[in-house]
A protein has these predicted regions:
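Extracytoplasmic/secretory soluble proteins
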Residues: 3, 24-537
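Sec-dependent N-terminal signal peptides of Gram-positive bacterial secreted proteins and lipoproteins
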Residues: 4-27
Length: 537
């Protein structure tokens, strides 16, 4: 009897387990209104609010006939990505600014879907983007012709990320004019240091010149590499790893005599105590906070930044003005230039991907097509119509100030929406009045605009974003650049602070060449020539 009971109990338990498993495997896969429920990952800014609070996103999913369960990631993405890709278990859709890279596509072939046919059949907005801006198709297309990730274009950002600011109040207090040459800048900075420019009775608390911390991987925004523009050189991205284009030739400024002149000038400033003594040791937070002064008392005379209120805060920003690029000397007949960053600021690659194993690719492409509608893209970038954007009733729109008056517009944007991390296309036909912060950036860029008049962005700037290297060439470039930057950036800080560039120059150039610089230039020249030929077809 006990044996029969035990056997019956075992059968009942087994059947219950089957029912539980059956129930678990049949969780709702569609919404009540019949939309498939899909899985997605979005790598977002840490400030960005939950996606269920974004009106534009909920509306886009409904119009596309899907519901996406988003995993919102703002930290440790590289670690998560490595395990996810290696295991081959990816969600239906992944969104984020190049969070899946061309190298990932090469390393994990077949994991992501080729969207070419889906775009032709289900994404008229994406197709229009490709037709209107052929460079967008170039960015999206891999060497084998597949489209595995889609790009973005956000249109409104200026030609450069870096503006140079000087304290006009200090100049007026000392009876000085805005400098126009390196020599004049030297004299102004010396006066800032020695003549109590902020008028507080302490001649030792002014910082004549400060720039953003320089890393080991190359130059970036808000750094003194922009002074290369005084020599007529057009760099991009603040200089990066030194590559630039001049008269159709790919070059590297780390072996260019003009770079030596800039470093020598910076060394002269350093020797006179005119550069912040912490310039090479501070972090970016310190760089920003120092420029904001103390109350209405400014601390920094001349520096670089994105926008006045962003750089200096609300208390001292009105003391500063944006100024044009400097000439090397008064008699110089060189056409000055500046760092051209429009491509880095407005374009982005691999913003969204679809998993090849997804069973709902057409629905996913319908959703992606929604994102590339200009009115939706506007909301991806700046936030929803209503709280973030006003619809004016005549086909035009206006970005609204933050609802939280204590929050600056930039923070409000990143809090409200996907912002620069989202797939989007701001069509030239969209009529949108920008917020005050972007208007200010535009106005503060105006002194620099003449420097770009002779620059052909398609031919005079290395088109790194529009080029797909083979895996072999990419590996070669990466390995060579790592070695070269370790040497070049350590020498930059050494030569600015201790001098010695004249004595060490020839040996330095030879070392860079031995590390593979000539090989890199040859590779990049080939890709640049192919790109130009493609433009001319």
């Amino acid at each position: 009897m006990n044996g029969k009971f035990s056997k019956s109990a075992s059968i009942i338990v087994f059947l219950l387990m089957i029912l539980v498993l059956f129930g678990c495997s049949n969780q709702p896969s569609v919404t009540e209104d019949g939309r498939p429920i899909l899985n997605g990952i979005m790598v977002k800014h840490a400030l960005t609010k939950g996606f269920d609070e974004m009106e534009w996103l909920q509306e886009a999913e409904e119009r596309a006939g899907v519901e996406i369960k988003w995993e919102e990631v703002s930290a440790d993405w590289d670690q998560k990505k490595g395990a996810m890709l290696a295991g081959g278990d990816i969600p239906d859709i992944i969104v984020g600014a190049n969070v899946i890279t061309n190298a990932d596509f090469a390393q994990f072939p077949g994991l992501f879907d080729d969207m070419t046919e889906l775009i032709e059949e289900h994404a008229p907005n994406v197709q229009k983007m490709f037709d209107d801006r052929p460079e967008m198709r170039i960015i999206a297309t891999q060497l084998d012709g597949q489209i595995l990730g889609l790009p973005k274009y956000q249109r409104y950002w200026p030609e450069t990320s870096t503006r140079q600011f000087i304290n006009k109040t200090w100049l007026d207090e000392l009876g000085l004019e805005i400098p126009t040459t390196w020599d004049e800048l030297f004299d102004v900075l010396k006066a800032f240091k020695e003549e109590d420019a902020n008028g507080n009775g302490n001649t030792n608390d002014e910082i004549p010149f400060d720039f953003s911390p320089v890393g080991t991987g190359g130059f970036g925004f808000f750094q003194p590499s922009v002074l290369l523009g005084s020599t007529g050189m057009t760099i991009s991205g603040g200089g990066g790893q030194g590559y630039f284009v001049e008269d159709g030739e790919v070059k590297n400024f780390f072996i260019d005599e003009r770079y030596k002149e800039v470093v020598s000038f910076l060394n002269e400033l350093w020797k006179e105590g005119l550069i912040n003594s912490e310039a090479f040791t501070q972090d970016y937070t310190k760089y920003q906070s120092t420029a904001r002064g103390s109350g209405n008392e400014a601390k920094v005379g001349y520096t670089f930044g994105w926008e006045l209120s962003d750089r200096f805060g609300t208390e001292v920003a009105d003391q500063y003005v944006s100024i044009p690029p400097l000439k090397m000397t008064e008699n110089s007949d060189i056409d000055v230039s500046w760092t051209y960053d429009y491509n880095q600021l407005n374009y982005g690659e691999n913003m969204v991907q679809i998993a090849s194993q997804s069973e709902h690719k057409e629905e996913l492409m319908a959703f992606i097509n929604e994102l590339y509608d200009p009115v939706v893209s506007m909301q991806v970038l700046f936030g929803s119509i209503g709280p973030n954007i006003e619809e004016n009733g005549d086909g035009t729109y206006s970005v609204l100030p933050p609802q939280d008056e204590s929050m600056d517009p930039g923070t409000w944007k990143w809090t409200s929406t996907w912002a620069d991390n989202g797939p989007l296309y701001i069509d030239d036909s969209l009529e949108l009045e920008l917020g005050e912060d972007m208007k200010s950036v535009g106005a503060q860029t105006e002194p620099l605009l003449p420097a770009f008049e002779s620059v052909d962005p398609l031919r005079d700037v290395y088109p790194g974003l529009f080029i797909k290297y083979s895996q072999e060439d990419n590996n070669t470039l990466s390995l060579n650049n790592t070695d070269m930057m370790n040497l070049a950036m350590s020498n930059f800080s050494l030569w600015v602070t201790d001098g010695g560039i004249e004595q060490g120059w020839d040996s330095f150039v030879e070392q860079l060449k031995n590390m593979g610089l000539d090989e890199n230039l040859e590779i990049m020249q080939g890709y640049y020539d192919d790109y130009i030929n493609q433009l001319d077809e």
